[in-house]
Amino acid sequence: MTTLKFRNNDKISAKVFILGSTEDINKIGLDQNEADYVKKSYDDDKKKTVVINRYTECFHIFFIDTTEDENKFMEQCRKKGASICKWLNTNKYEEVLIQNIGGKRCVKMGTAEGMMLANYEFKKYKTDAKANSLKTIYFLEGTACEDCVEKLNITVEATLMARDLVNEPVNQLNAEKLAEFISEKVRSVGGEAEIFNKKKIEALKMGGLLAVNAGSIDEPTFTILEWKPENPVNEKPIVLVGKGIVFDTGGYNLKTSNFMNDMKDDMSGAATVACTVYAVAKAKLPLHVIALVPATDNRIDGNARVCGDIITMYDGTTVEVLNTDAEGRLILADALAYAKKYSPMMVFDFATLTGAASRAIGPVATVAMEHNAEEIYKQLEAVGERVYERLVKFPLYEEYGEMIKSDLADIQNIGGAYGGASTAGKFLEHFTDYPWVHFDIAGTAFLEKAEAYKPAGGVGIHVRLLMRFFRDMVKKD
């Protein structure tokens, strides 16, 4: 991981200068020819990054208009950081110094964040892989608060950890290994963890998790991760629930190969919530936060559930299973019902749940829904705009509840041909009685190709959003 640090001098060969206007050009040590070149480049294209490549050092110079919408110019800084990171690695630089000349300090943080996120790579299974050269990003001492730098390092570390988990294939990370890894990580920073094995899950009668696991050669797990500091600002805990389908074949509603190839990503929700608790604990935030991670793969054998089976969930609800590929909601339902025992302040669930959500808005935003949490959702939405992990609210109309009524059981696990994201949300809502927000990350958790600071593969989506949301909660107290 690339780390962000302070240094007491600018004697370094690679520098990034962020300028607020052309008046700042003469403040960065350029000779007249270089300054004229930068000015002409700016006049030709105000969004261009100008590279001054000397024999012993290089400068990357770009301009940010901080009079624009802050969310947009911060995203511009992240993208600039990502592109500069690529150049630095291509040219084998190991360190870089970022300075903002005029304007707001936050542009420097955004640029560093973009570099750190863009420098991610997952090459552990390549026998001849060479790591990226960039190792350290520097600010000059006194030009940013130490706390802000520490926050960014922790948040990026957790985001990259989530990416790693999503990118691991199931033969390396089954449900048991996932549970062990996230438990060890949370304990390493002072949190607590408990893993329920199959016997315990059977005793709790978590029928959804057991039904999905019926065709697997590996046992399911249900992991509880907790960070409970002394005197937390929240009297009731915040509970995060993450879908942990470590691989999804679709069951007897078998996926075709083009839809199955990336189904190691079906535990992205689990990665998000587990790595967020890790970050909260490492940052020692005064918040009581719990993550619930039901985990299994969804495979086929002679014991696997088939269409038409009726199962009984943790809370006693009976469910007619009409599609074995709508399995994520079954394991989430048990976890959401289990969350009631904590009398939570709020509950958020994260799941690569429906193709309908992905098809509706693609990879540029996450579909979200809420029940009895309108103000909380508005805060999350605003934070999503700030970190550019945007949310689009879908409805939970009562008519969607009619679509999942069953003639043979209390409810069924799919609706009709339309409104698939909302009928899935309505199914989950049945198991809640607290302020709840549902995040369907099917379109945002895993990318086919890299986009600026987001890599191809696992994105680690919404760790950044949650950490900003939680820090805002602490500030308001």
List each language-model region with its residue ranges.
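Short amphipathic alpha-helical segment within the helicase RecA-like ATPase core
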Residues: 1-244
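A generic structural signal for tightly packed, nonpolar segments enriched in small/aliphatic residues
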Residues: 1-3, 56, 70, 179-477
